[in-house]
Amino acid sequence: MRTTLAILFAFIVFVSMNNSTFAQSAQGNVFVVTNFERAFPDNGSNREMDSLTTLYMEKCFGQENEYVVSYKLLRHWWGHNNRDFIQVVEVKTWDDVTKANQKSGELFEEAWPTEAAQDAFNDAYNKYFTGKHSDEIYSEVVAP
């Protein structure tokens, strides 16, 4: 009897101290963050870069891409290095990261249907970047 009470007491203490083990953890959305290093070509302008970037994001990650919850474009605003250009794409789940990326590829081919059109867009757009970038994937912190 004494052993049974001790085990029962230990179980009650364990359960009361660790009540989160029985609750499912809340899962927030997933954020894919890409930090591009900007280039400043002599034959370019902020206006053209903004126009091309907006066009690309709207066509590939906008309303037609059902896996994307939201997207943001962030430009370095203050400090010593103004080369940071950050793209943030929000999706609901880890699986949606791949699905959103695949869909954006399909939408890119719809928006620029020929190889010549794709090359022309890529040449115009890519001149604004050095080719250096980093990719990170974050999950939203949600209270349990």
Residue ranges and their predicted role:
Residues 1-27:
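Bacterial Sec-dependent N-terminal signal peptides
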Residues 20-84, 90-109, 122-144:
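Short S/T/G/P-rich N-terminal loop/turn motif that feeds into the first structured element of a domain
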Residues 109-115:
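Charged, solvent-exposed helices and adjacent loops that form client-binding or oligomerization surfaces
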Residues 67, 115-118:
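Residue-level signal for alpha-helical context at structural boundaries
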